[in-house]
């Protein structure tokens, strides 16, 4: 989605620490019209992030909100769905293709055994799959322009949003380490180990 295709203004919104400004400037260099940072040093759970985004979105009233399907830290896959419920927006998840047609969006999503295409009314929340789009490279002139553009930074504490976490992290455990592999000298040795040790053949 880029402004040159006549799809309206593109706003980049992010919840995070002050160093998140780097990602916002990258978005500006790639063609976003505005960038908004809801700034906090706290580690927020999906519900809190959805509340913050809801507050920002209510002020802007966009017709389409696009999010990643899940964060790489918690891997929760919850924020988009919670946000759609809070705003009473249509929603579609795991989108690999999105086509906008006036007041509707046609969304193709990968499911077990094939592809599913659904039609949702706008405004809508869509979470994306990696296959939706291949990011473009920003040109050097646009990178330099983005450095001079003003960012809209809003401390979360001033937004009147309850960001208290409702979840308690009890533990994080690494998976069991795999046994180191061995090399065998011959096919006979391999067959013997598969029979006697692995017991996968008889």
List each language-model region with its residue ranges.
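Single conserved hydrophobic/aromatic residue that forms the stacking wall/gate
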Residues: 1-11
